[in-house]
Swiss-Prot record:
UniProt GO MF annotations: ABC-type vitamin B12 transporter activity; threonine-phosphate decarboxylase activity
Native organism: Salmonella typhi
Topology relative to the membrane: Multi-pass membrane protein
Pathway: Cofactor biosynthesis; adenosylcobalamin biosynthesis; adenosylcobalamin from cob(II)yrinate a,c-diamide: step 4/7
Encoding gene, per UniProt annotation: cbiB
UniProt keyword annotation of Transmembrane helix present: yes
Swiss-Prot/TrEMBL GO biological process terms: cobalamin biosynthetic process
UniProt superkingdom: Bacteria
Parts of the chain that traverse the membrane: 52-74, 79-101, 155-177, 207-229, 296-318
Localisation: Cell membrane
This protein's name: Cobalamin biosynthesis protein CbiB
One Gene Ontology term, aspect cellular component: plasma membrane
Family according to the record: Belongs to the CobD/CbiB family.
Keyword set, alphabetical order: Cell membrane, Cobalamin biosynthesis, Membrane, Transmembrane, Transmembrane helix
InterPro entries in the cross-refs: Cobalamin_biosynth_CobD/CbiB
Length: 319
Protein backbone atom coordinates (compact mmCIF):
# COMPACT_ATOMS: atom_id res chain seq x y z
CA UNK A 1 0.00 0.00 0.00
CA UNK A 2 2.88 2.36 0.75
CA UNK A 3 4.42 1.89 -2.69
CA UNK A 4 1.00 2.26 -4.30
CA UNK A 5 0.57 5.56 -2.46
CA UNK A 6 3.92 6.78 -3.82
CA UNK A 7 2.96 5.84 -7.38
CA UNK A 8 -0.50 7.39 -7.26
CA UNK A 9 0.88 10.61 -5.76
CA UNK A 10 3.52 10.78 -8.50
CA UNK A 11 0.93 10.19 -11.23
CA UNK A 12 -1.34 12.87 -9.75
CA UNK A 13 1.53 15.34 -9.82
CA UNK A 14 2.33 14.36 -13.40
CA UNK A 15 -1.28 14.83 -14.53
CA UNK A 16 -2.59 17.81 -12.58
CA UNK A 17 0.25 19.33 -10.55
CA UNK A 18 -0.79 21.95 -8.00
CA UNK A 19 -4.00 23.73 -9.07
CA UNK A 20 -3.58 27.38 -8.17
CA UNK A 21 -6.57 27.75 -5.87
CA UNK A 22 -6.34 24.41 -4.07
CA UNK A 23 -5.19 24.42 -0.45
CA UNK A 24 -1.50 23.56 -0.27
CA UNK A 25 0.74 22.84 2.75
CA UNK A 26 3.63 24.88 1.32
CA UNK A 27 1.45 27.99 1.47
CA UNK A 28 0.67 27.21 5.11
CA UNK A 29 4.36 26.68 5.79
CA UNK A 30 5.06 30.03 4.15
CA UNK A 31 2.56 31.76 6.43
CA UNK A 32 4.14 30.09 9.46
CA UNK A 33 7.59 31.29 8.36
CA UNK A 34 6.30 34.84 7.93
CA UNK A 35 4.71 34.76 11.39
CA UNK A 36 7.78 33.34 13.16
CA UNK A 37 10.15 35.63 11.23
CA UNK A 38 8.17 38.66 12.40
CA UNK A 39 8.58 37.57 16.02
CA UNK A 40 12.30 36.85 15.60
CA UNK A 41 12.96 40.26 14.06
CA UNK A 42 11.06 41.96 16.86
CA UNK A 43 13.01 40.33 19.68
CA UNK A 44 16.42 39.75 18.08
CA UNK A 45 18.20 43.03 17.28
CA UNK A 46 21.65 42.77 15.73
CA UNK A 47 23.23 40.16 13.45
CA UNK A 48 24.33 37.76 16.19
CA UNK A 49 20.88 37.67 17.76
CA UNK A 50 19.29 37.29 14.32
CA UNK A 51 21.50 34.30 13.53
CA UNK A 52 20.42 32.62 16.77
CA UNK A 53 16.80 33.61 16.19
CA UNK A 54 17.01 32.31 12.64
CA UNK A 55 18.19 28.96 14.00
CA UNK A 56 15.27 28.86 16.42
CA UNK A 57 12.93 29.76 13.57
CA UNK A 58 14.29 26.84 11.53
CA UNK A 59 13.75 24.37 14.37
CA UNK A 60 10.23 25.66 15.06
CA UNK A 61 9.07 25.63 11.45
CA UNK A 62 10.56 22.25 10.54
CA UNK A 63 9.50 20.70 13.85
CA UNK A 64 5.94 21.98 13.64
CA UNK A 65 5.64 20.84 10.02
CA UNK A 66 6.83 17.31 10.82
CA UNK A 67 4.68 17.12 13.95
CA UNK A 68 1.51 18.32 12.25
CA UNK A 69 2.04 15.98 9.29
CA UNK A 70 2.61 13.02 11.61
CA UNK A 71 -0.39 13.95 13.76
CA UNK A 72 -2.74 14.40 10.82
CA UNK A 73 -1.72 11.03 9.38
CA UNK A 74 -2.11 9.28 12.74
CA UNK A 75 -5.56 10.82 13.27
CA UNK A 76 -6.66 9.93 9.75
CA UNK A 77 -5.53 6.33 10.27
CA UNK A 78 -7.56 6.12 13.48
CA UNK A 79 -10.67 7.36 11.68
CA UNK A 80 -10.30 4.69 8.99
CA UNK A 81 -7.30 2.99 7.35
CA UNK A 82 -8.49 3.92 3.86
CA UNK A 83 -8.97 7.52 4.92
CA UNK A 84 -5.47 7.52 6.37
CA UNK A 85 -4.10 6.10 3.14
CA UNK A 86 -5.92 8.76 1.10
CA UNK A 87 -4.49 11.51 3.30
CA UNK A 88 -1.03 10.01 2.85
CA UNK A 89 -1.44 10.08 -0.94
CA UNK A 90 -2.56 13.71 -0.81
CA UNK A 91 0.33 14.66 1.46
CA UNK A 92 2.93 13.02 -0.79
CA UNK A 93 1.31 14.60 -3.84
CA UNK A 94 1.74 18.07 -2.33
CA UNK A 95 5.48 17.53 -1.80
CA UNK A 96 6.09 16.93 -5.51
CA UNK A 97 6.41 19.84 -7.91
CA UNK A 98 7.21 18.34 -11.29
CA UNK A 99 4.09 19.48 -13.13
CA UNK A 100 4.21 22.94 -11.55
CA UNK A 101 7.85 23.30 -12.59
CA UNK A 102 7.14 22.15 -16.13
CA UNK A 103 4.12 24.44 -16.38
CA UNK A 104 6.10 27.45 -15.12
CA UNK A 105 8.85 26.81 -17.67
CA UNK A 106 6.32 26.44 -20.47
CA UNK A 107 4.69 29.72 -19.44
CA UNK A 108 8.01 31.41 -20.23
CA UNK A 109 8.63 29.33 -23.35
CA UNK A 110 5.27 30.14 -24.96
CA UNK A 111 5.74 33.93 -25.36
CA UNK A 112 9.33 33.33 -26.46
CA UNK A 113 8.06 31.29 -29.38
CA UNK A 114 5.60 34.10 -30.15
CA UNK A 115 8.43 36.68 -30.05
CA UNK A 116 6.84 38.40 -27.05
CA UNK A 117 10.01 39.22 -25.13
CA UNK A 118 8.31 41.50 -22.59
CA UNK A 119 5.81 38.81 -21.57
CA UNK A 120 8.52 36.15 -21.27
CA UNK A 121 10.52 38.45 -18.98
CA UNK A 122 7.48 38.92 -16.74
CA UNK A 123 6.76 35.19 -16.58
CA UNK A 124 10.42 34.45 -15.87
CA UNK A 125 10.46 36.93 -12.99
CA UNK A 126 7.87 34.76 -11.24
CA UNK A 127 10.24 31.81 -10.95
CA UNK A 128 13.75 33.29 -10.59
CA UNK A 129 15.42 35.73 -8.23
CA UNK A 130 17.53 37.50 -10.85
CA UNK A 131 16.62 40.78 -12.53
CA UNK A 132 14.80 39.86 -15.75
CA UNK A 133 13.93 43.34 -17.04
CA UNK A 134 16.80 43.57 -19.53
CA UNK A 135 17.37 39.92 -20.40
CA UNK A 136 17.70 38.93 -24.03
CA UNK A 137 16.23 35.68 -25.43
CA UNK A 138 19.40 33.58 -24.98
CA UNK A 139 19.68 34.75 -21.36
CA UNK A 140 16.05 33.82 -20.75
CA UNK A 141 16.58 30.36 -22.25
CA UNK A 142 19.54 29.91 -19.94
CA UNK A 143 17.60 31.06 -16.87
CA UNK A 144 14.73 28.65 -17.55
CA UNK A 145 17.02 25.68 -18.21
CA UNK A 146 18.95 26.42 -15.01
CA UNK A 147 15.72 26.71 -13.00
CA UNK A 148 14.31 23.42 -14.25
CA UNK A 149 17.64 21.63 -13.76
CA UNK A 150 18.12 22.96 -10.22
CA UNK A 151 14.53 22.37 -9.15
CA UNK A 152 14.53 18.82 -10.45
CA UNK A 153 16.42 18.16 -7.22
CA UNK A 154 14.38 20.04 -4.64
CA UNK A 155 11.05 19.70 -6.45
CA UNK A 156 11.12 15.96 -7.13
CA UNK A 157 14.22 13.92 -6.30
CA UNK A 158 14.74 15.24 -2.76
CA UNK A 159 11.08 14.86 -1.68
CA UNK A 160 11.13 11.27 -2.97
CA UNK A 161 14.42 10.68 -1.15
CA UNK A 162 13.02 11.85 2.19
CA UNK A 163 9.76 10.02 1.52
CA UNK A 164 11.83 6.85 1.20
CA UNK A 165 13.73 7.61 4.42
CA UNK A 166 10.86 8.66 6.67
CA UNK A 167 7.52 8.60 4.93
CA UNK A 168 5.21 11.51 4.21
CA UNK A 169 5.98 13.43 7.47
CA UNK A 170 9.71 13.58 6.66
CA UNK A 171 8.97 14.58 3.07
CA UNK A 172 6.80 17.40 4.44
CA UNK A 173 9.59 18.42 6.82
CA UNK A 174 11.92 18.62 3.82
CA UNK A 175 9.46 20.95 2.09
CA UNK A 176 9.64 23.17 5.17
CA UNK A 177 13.45 23.17 4.94
CA UNK A 178 13.26 24.08 1.26
CA UNK A 179 10.61 26.77 1.78
CA UNK A 180 12.68 28.37 4.53
CA UNK A 181 15.63 28.58 2.16
CA UNK A 182 13.42 30.02 -0.59
CA UNK A 183 12.05 32.72 1.69
CA UNK A 184 15.01 33.74 3.86
CA UNK A 185 18.13 31.91 2.61
CA UNK A 186 19.68 34.86 0.78
CA UNK A 187 23.09 36.49 1.10
CA UNK A 188 22.08 40.12 0.81
CA UNK A 189 21.83 42.32 3.89
CA UNK A 190 18.17 41.84 4.81
CA UNK A 191 18.38 38.05 5.12
CA UNK A 192 22.07 37.25 5.58
CA UNK A 193 21.84 36.83 9.36
CA UNK A 194 18.33 35.52 9.90
CA UNK A 195 18.57 33.15 6.94
CA UNK A 196 22.04 31.73 7.59
CA UNK A 197 20.85 28.55 9.31
CA UNK A 198 18.05 28.02 6.79
CA UNK A 199 20.47 28.31 3.86
CA UNK A 200 23.02 25.94 5.38
CA UNK A 201 20.46 23.35 6.43
CA UNK A 202 19.00 23.38 2.93
CA UNK A 203 22.51 22.61 1.65
CA UNK A 204 22.72 19.70 4.10
CA UNK A 205 19.28 18.35 3.16
CA UNK A 206 20.01 18.47 -0.57
CA UNK A 207 23.55 17.09 -0.34
CA UNK A 208 22.74 13.48 -1.25
CA UNK A 209 19.75 14.18 -3.57
CA UNK A 210 21.85 16.61 -5.62
CA UNK A 211 24.57 14.02 -6.16
CA UNK A 212 21.98 11.40 -6.97
CA UNK A 213 20.53 13.77 -9.57
CA UNK A 214 23.87 13.70 -11.40
CA UNK A 215 23.51 9.96 -11.98
CA UNK A 216 19.77 10.03 -12.72
CA UNK A 217 20.02 12.94 -15.17
CA UNK A 218 22.98 11.29 -16.86
CA UNK A 219 20.96 8.11 -17.40
CA UNK A 220 17.96 10.20 -18.45
CA UNK A 221 20.10 11.95 -21.07
CA UNK A 222 20.95 8.61 -22.65
CA UNK A 223 17.30 7.53 -22.61
CA UNK A 224 16.34 10.84 -24.25
CA UNK A 225 18.86 10.23 -27.07
CA UNK A 226 21.15 12.94 -25.81
CA UNK A 227 24.74 12.40 -24.71
CA UNK A 228 24.55 10.54 -21.42
CA UNK A 229 28.32 10.12 -21.20
CA UNK A 230 28.93 13.82 -21.83
CA UNK A 231 26.27 14.69 -19.26
CA UNK A 232 28.04 12.62 -16.61
CA UNK A 233 31.49 13.89 -17.59
CA UNK A 234 30.57 17.59 -17.60
CA UNK A 235 28.40 17.10 -14.53
CA UNK A 236 31.37 15.71 -12.63
CA UNK A 237 33.88 18.21 -14.00
CA UNK A 238 31.79 21.32 -13.23
CA UNK A 239 30.04 20.06 -10.10
CA UNK A 240 31.58 22.80 -7.95
CA UNK A 241 31.14 25.70 -10.39
CA UNK A 242 28.52 27.34 -8.20
CA UNK A 243 28.37 29.15 -4.87
CA UNK A 244 26.01 26.42 -3.68
CA UNK A 245 27.56 23.01 -2.97
CA UNK A 246 24.58 21.34 -4.64
CA UNK A 247 23.19 23.36 -7.55
CA UNK A 248 25.89 22.67 -10.11
CA UNK A 249 25.47 18.89 -9.96
CA UNK A 250 22.16 18.94 -11.84
CA UNK A 251 22.85 22.10 -13.85
CA UNK A 252 26.20 20.83 -15.13
CA UNK A 253 24.71 17.46 -16.01
CA UNK A 254 21.95 19.12 -18.05
CA UNK A 255 24.47 21.46 -19.69
CA UNK A 256 26.57 18.46 -20.69
CA UNK A 257 23.56 16.55 -22.00
CA UNK A 258 22.50 19.48 -24.18
CA UNK A 259 25.98 20.65 -25.17
CA UNK A 260 25.34 24.19 -23.94
CA UNK A 261 26.77 26.59 -21.39
CA UNK A 262 24.95 27.73 -18.24
CA UNK A 263 25.88 30.00 -15.33
CA UNK A 264 27.74 33.27 -15.85
CA UNK A 265 26.93 36.78 -14.57
CA UNK A 266 23.46 37.81 -13.35
CA UNK A 267 21.87 40.61 -11.33
CA UNK A 268 20.17 39.73 -8.03
CA UNK A 269 18.36 42.39 -5.96
CA UNK A 270 20.31 45.14 -7.72
CA UNK A 271 23.70 43.47 -7.20
CA UNK A 272 25.79 41.89 -9.96
CA UNK A 273 26.79 38.31 -9.18
CA UNK A 274 29.51 36.72 -11.32
CA UNK A 275 28.99 32.97 -11.36
CA UNK A 276 31.40 30.54 -13.02
CA UNK A 277 30.37 29.18 -16.38
CA UNK A 278 29.04 25.62 -16.42
CA UNK A 279 29.41 23.31 -19.41
CA UNK A 280 30.96 23.76 -22.85
CA UNK A 281 29.29 25.92 -25.50
CA UNK A 282 29.34 23.35 -28.28
CA UNK A 283 26.41 25.25 -29.77
CA UNK A 284 24.27 28.23 -28.91
CA UNK A 285 21.41 27.72 -26.49
CA UNK A 286 17.94 27.75 -28.10
CA UNK A 287 14.31 27.88 -27.04
CA UNK A 288 14.03 24.14 -27.77
CA UNK A 289 16.41 23.48 -24.89
CA UNK A 290 13.61 24.39 -22.49
CA UNK A 291 11.42 21.50 -23.64
CA UNK A 292 14.45 19.19 -23.75
CA UNK A 293 15.24 20.03 -20.12
CA UNK A 294 11.63 19.42 -19.08
CA UNK A 295 11.83 16.00 -20.72
CA UNK A 296 15.06 15.25 -18.86
CA UNK A 297 13.36 16.25 -15.62
CA UNK A 298 10.46 13.86 -16.15
CA UNK A 299 12.65 10.92 -17.13
CA UNK A 300 14.97 11.52 -14.16
CA UNK A 301 12.01 11.78 -11.78
CA UNK A 302 10.61 8.49 -13.12
CA UNK A 303 13.99 6.87 -12.55
CA UNK A 304 14.10 8.28 -9.02
CA UNK A 305 10.68 6.85 -8.21
CA UNK A 306 11.69 3.45 -9.62
CA UNK A 307 14.95 3.51 -7.66
CA UNK A 308 13.29 4.24 -4.33
CA UNK A 309 10.55 1.67 -4.96
CA UNK A 310 13.22 -0.94 -5.71
CA UNK A 311 15.14 0.05 -2.58
CA UNK A 312 11.97 -0.13 -0.48
CA UNK A 313 11.14 -3.56 -1.87
CA UNK A 314 14.69 -4.74 -1.24
CA UNK A 315 14.67 -3.55 2.36
CA UNK A 316 11.23 -4.99 3.10
CA UNK A 317 11.88 -8.26 1.29
CA UNK A 318 9.07 -7.73 -1.22
CA UNK A 319 9.74 -9.41 -4.52
Amino acid sequence: MTILAWCIAWVLDFIIGDPQHWPHPVRWIGRLITFVQRIVRRYCPGDKALRIGGGVMWVVVVGVTWGVAWGVLALAQRIHPWFGWSVEVWMIFTTLAGRSLARAAQEVERPLRENDLAESRIKLSWIVGRDTSQLQPAQIYRAVVETVAENTVDGIIAPLFFLFLGGAPLAMAYKAVNTLDSMVGYKHEKYRAIGMVSARMDDVANYLPARLSWLLLGIAAGLCRLSGWRALRIGWRDRYNHSSPNCAWSEACVAGALGIQLGGPNNYFGERVDKPWIGDAQRGISVDDISRTIRLMWVASTLALALFIAARCGLSGVA
